A protein has these predicted regions:
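Short, small-residue-biased leader/transition segments that mark boundaries at the very start
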Residues: 2-7
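Hydrophobic beta-strand scaffold residues
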Residues: 8-9, 88, 158, 189
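Adenosine-phosphate binding glycine-rich loop
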Residues: 12-53, 163, 168-261
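Conserved beta-strand edge residues that scaffold enzyme active sites
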Residues: 14-15, 95, 137
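Electropositive phosphate-/nucleotide-binding environments in soluble metabolic enzymes
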Residues: 26-33, 71, 75, 91, ...
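Glycine-rich phosphate/diphosphate-binding loop of Rossmann-like nucleotide-binding domains
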Residues: 46-131, 181
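Rossmann-like adenosine-cofactor binding region
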Residues: 103-185
Length: 261
């Protein structure tokens, strides 16, 4: 039997000491901003939405946007939505993060400590929901269930940025740029699995800027020394010579976890 020599370093799990994910940040920034751009488009009546302009006009209130998750995706979505004049709420379970967002985002962005009850209270008059919850290396939690769809008005738009991690809406399944949406119980679902792929020029440059230092380190030092010198890169290791060395990945796929020495 041929020995498996694959060394796999995963972008999503390269993690710095402050728990930031440097190789995921660029695509998260793009996806967060695109989620609002796409959400606004599918709120238009010809696209199956309510026919609401995200920022409203004088005398007509703007759309209400609920963003689930205040990380990089969520904060960029909030910044974009606020800039377009929407009524924005960001929900998260990290109070420190909520304080930071409250201090740094525009004043038309409100923060909310997330719970099932509080999310349910927001749904009846929400127009656009962005799902942006990330658990590194693991599946996203389902924050909106099938039953909760009935609490929203027909034409409400759900954008599931977490679809790459399984989605944070129970009714989500991956879609494509050529067929980005589907409707369940009157609710428009947008769940494109590679949102940044719609803007490849911007996405490629942003990702290259973040990736290049790691590529140079790997090329100059080899993977062992590069990972030894940089703990963030070492955390990105998922598979080494056929062994799964990242616990969350092993758990998700029910594989044996073999920590690297």
């Amino acid at each position: 039997r041929q020995r498996q020599m694959c060394i796999r370093d995963r972008y999503e799990t390269v993690e710095k000491a402050d728990h930031s994910l440097p190789l995921l940040i660029p695509m998260s920034e793009v996806a967060g901003r695109m989620s609002i751009q796409e959400g606004a488009r599918f709120l238009e009546k010809p696209q199956g939405g309510k026919g609401i302009l995200l920022g409203g006009v004088p005398g007509v209130k703007p759309a209400k946007v609920l963003i689930l998750g205040g990380g990089i995706v969520g904060s960029n979505a909030a910044q974009m939505a606020a800039g377009m004049g929407a009524d924005v709420t960001v929900a998260d379970i990290n109070l420190s993060r909520l304080r930071y967002l409250s201090e740094t985002l525009p004043k038309n962005v409100k923060t909310l400590y997330a719970s099932e009850l509080r999310i349910k209270k927001e749904l009846p008059d929400v127009d656009l929901v962005i799902g942006s919850v990330l658990i590194p290396g693991n599946k996203a939690p389902h924050l909106i269930t099938r039953k909760m769809l009935a609490m929203m008005q027909p034409g409400t738009v759900l954008v599931d940025v977490a679809i790459d991690q399984g989605g944070c809406f129970e009714t989500s399944h991956p879609t494509t740029h050529s067929a980005p949406t589907y409707v369940i119980d009157g609710i428009v679902h947008y769940a494109v699995a590679n949102i940044p792929g719609a803007v490849p020029y911007t996405s490629t440059l942003a990702l290259t800027n973040a990736t290049l230092p790691y590529v140079i380190a790997l090329a100059n030092k080899g993977w062992k020394k590069a990972c030894k010198d940089d703990p963030a890169l070492a955390l990105g290791l998922n598979v080494v010579e056929g062994k799964v060395v990242y616990k969350a990945v092993a758990d998700v796929f029910d594989l044996k976890y073999e920590p690297i020495n």
